[in-house]
Amino acid sequence: MASKSQHNAPKVKSPNGKAGSQGQWGRAWEVDWFSLASIIFLLLFAPFIVYYFIMACDQYSCSLTAPALDIATGHASLADIWAKTPPVTAKAAQLYALWVSFQVLLYSWLPDFCHRFLPGYVGGVQEGAITPAGVVNKYEVNGLQAWLITHILWFVNAYLLSWFSPTIIFDNWIPLLWCANILGYAVSTFAMIKGYLFPTSAEDCKFTGNFFYNYMMGIEFNPRIGKWFDFKLFFNGRPGIVAWTLINLSFAAKQQELYGHVTNSMILVNVLQAIYVLDFFWNETWYLKTIDICHDHFGWYLGWGDCVWLPYLYTLQGLYLVYHPVQLSTPNALGILLLGLVGYYIFRMTNHQKDLFRRTDGRCLIWGKKPKAIECSYTSADGLKHHSKLLVSGFWGVARHFNYTGDLMGSLAYCLACGGGHLLPYFYIIYMTILLTHRCLRDEHRCANKYGRDWERYTAAVPYRLLPGIF
């Protein structure tokens, strides 16, 4: 448990980026040239990357090379491809507006009741981690409830009342893409303006002096409207992750409509990804203590990424299987299922061990033994000194980010379910490997700055990051 002492408030950096003294914890104040170049590249090309993948499925049966070859050989032009792309429609705009409004309603106006009758589930009003400025925010954790209500209404309306077709998401997939982009850019722009003009917590704002970096990575740490509507928690969990399983169900329904059956590969993708989604919402309180909430500021990276990148690229396996139905042999299907379940077990148990250690302040058993830890201290931006412990027992003694290793095993299982016919469904494992490796290195850089020599003692005790004996 953290204790506090030695209050000495530092100066805060001004919006024009001029220097002032800073705390030892939080996102970097200065921007190096590589980070800036990477950010400008993503701002320019990430929307195009999403469009290219979705267009390749719609017009080229999920081939990533065919569009480029058509353009290179003169068989098609960019104008030809764009002309075949469905535009935004009034129906898609209405669907998307209704969807987002419904999720806002569930998030903001319906207090959680699941924690009252589900044993082991922690919901309702919960505290987040302490921010770099020393603030502890409160959250209404009701994601599981929102997921359950949404999916019950989906099945009732689509299959019992027949108010809409269960293929409605697939049938409007590209028009919905334009709506998601509009929301992503709108909320990111609003968050930046809010950070300058009326931030929720000015002490947790960071200005680098670079417009592109501020827009991409965000200024405010926890932008809010009112007491409870937290931008970061809402957009991280809703509407993208609630939609994830609905999108997959719509893809499965389309496969049924086109071919008269649903393949075992589509079932595998739906089941394995649903486990991940349900795990996220079951452990939403734990999520309040992860890097997304505890370190990232809210900018385009989270705002646009959660609206567009996540729902469109994380569901590529289901989309691919609509165009290329794959029926796996029973041994292959069981092997992929086992890989996904083992990966999930490692991911969940690794996180559970850390959560158990934190909740009990180390007074627990991990793998039948009293856990070992490295004692650390750090100073927040308000000048207060805090103490914490870094776990070196259980899976956390195997590698410093073994939860990421389990996550990558599950990600690989999603992709393997699609067979080896095309590269497109394997984008997810490639992307997740890059993302989690970068996150691993970024987290370690942050922890090195935060804990100093204590971090060196920790890395000596647990020398490997992701793969024991290798990396």
UniProtKB/Swiss-Prot annotation:
Record's bilayer topology term: Multi-pass membrane protein
Transmembrane segments: 36-56, 95-115, 144-164, 173-193, 233-253, 262-282, 302-322, 327-347, 416-436
EC code: 1.3.1.21, 3.3.2.11
One BP annotation, GO: regulation of cell population proliferation
Subcellular location: Endoplasmic reticulum membrane
Main subcellular localisation: endoplasmic reticulum
Record flagged with keyword Hydrolase: yes
Listed GO CC annotations: endoplasmic reticulum membrane
Record's catalysed reaction(s): cholesterol + NADP(+) = 7-dehydrocholesterol + NADPH + H(+); 7-dehydrodesmosterol + NADPH + H(+) = desmosterol + NADP(+); 5,6alpha-epoxy-5alpha-cholestan-3beta-ol + H2O = 5alpha-cholestane-3beta,5,6beta-triol; 5,6beta-epoxy-5beta-cholestan-3beta-ol + H2O = 5alpha-cholestane-3beta,5,6beta-triol
Function: Oxidoreductase that catalyzes the last step of the cholesterol synthesis pathway, which transforms cholesta-5,7-dien-3beta-ol (7-dehydrocholesterol,7-DHC) into cholesterol by reducing the C7-C8 double bond of its sterol core. Can also metabolize cholesta-5,7,24-trien-3beta-ol (7-dehydrodemosterol, 7-DHD) to desmosterol, which is then metabolized by the Delta(24)-sterol reductase (DHCR24) to cholesterol. Component of the microsomal antiestrogen binding site (AEBS), a multiproteic complex at the ER membrane that consists of an association between cholestenol Delta-isomerase/EBP and DHCR7. This complex is responsible for cholesterol-5,6-epoxide hydrolase (ChEH) activity, which consists in the hydration of cholesterol-5,6-epoxides (5,6-EC) into cholestane-3beta,5alpha,6beta-triol (CT). The precise role of each component of this complex has not been described yet.
Family: Belongs to the ERG4/ERG24 family.
Protein name as annotated: 7-dehydrocholesterol reductase
Organism expressing this protein natively: Mus musculus
